[in-house]
From Swiss-Prot:
Protein name: Phosphoribosyl-AMP cyclohydrolase
Coiled coil feature spans: none
Positions annotated to bind Zn(2+): C75, C91, C98
Gene field: hisI
Organism listed in the record: Syntrophus aciditrophicus (strain SB)
Gene3D superfamilies per UniProt: 4.10.80.70, Phosphoribosyl-AMP cyclohydrolase
A GO molecular function held by the record: zinc ion binding
Keywords per UniProt: Amino-acid biosynthesis, Cytoplasm, Histidine biosynthesis, Hydrolase, Magnesium, Metal-binding, Zinc
Catalytic activities: 1-(5-phospho-beta-D-ribosyl)-5'-AMP + H2O = 1-(5-phospho-beta-D-ribosyl)-5-[(5-phospho-beta-D-ribosylamino)methylideneamino]imidazole-4-carboxamide
Cofactor note: Binds 1 Mg(2+) ion per subunit. Binds 1 zinc ion per subunit.
Lineage: Bacteria, Pseudomonadati, Thermodesulfobacteriota, Syntrophia, Syntrophales
Main location group: cytoplasm
Pfam families for the chain: PRA-CH
Record-level GO cellular component terms: cytoplasm
Annotated function: Catalyzes the hydrolysis of the adenine ring of phosphoribosyl-AMP.
């Protein structure tokens, strides 16, 4: 099976996640070889949580799964783009995308759509 070069990034590669229809950037996460293999095997995005130091199946707690539709790999084979069918919010804050804020001068402007209350989703 083809796979990214996990050596360059000390075992991790960045995974940029995009909506497969709109092209909207939903999030950035990291994958190790184990999460890569699980993702390829299951068809659901699985990442490596750097804070918890464990595998993380996107949507396992919230129900907001990311179904893989296409995978792109960069020229150095050390970063990927996952084109996904997003169910619900991609961001743990309840927004559709983790990139829901725009920098305007010295402040943030909310430009994204909040889909859920995280207090209700992550009980």
């Amino acid at each position: 099976m083809l796979e990214p070069d996990f050596v360059k990034g000390n075992g991790l590669i960045p995974a940029i996640v995009q909506d497969c229809i709109t092209g909207e950037v939903l999030m950035l996460a990291y994958m190790n070889r184990e999460s890569w293999l699980k993702t390829r095997e299951s068809g659901k995005a699985t990442y490596w949580s750097r804070s918890r130091n464990s595998l993380w199946i996107k949507g396992e707690t919230s129900g907001h799964y990311q179904i893989i539709k296409e995978i792109l790999i960069d020229c150095d084979a050390d970063a990927i783009v996952l084109k996904v069918q997003q169910t619900g919010a991609a961001c743990h804050t309840g927004y559709r995308s983790c990139f829901y804020r725009k920098i305007v001068g010295e402040s943030f402007e909310i430009i994204g759509e909040k889909l859920v209350d995280p207090e209700e989703v992550y009980k």
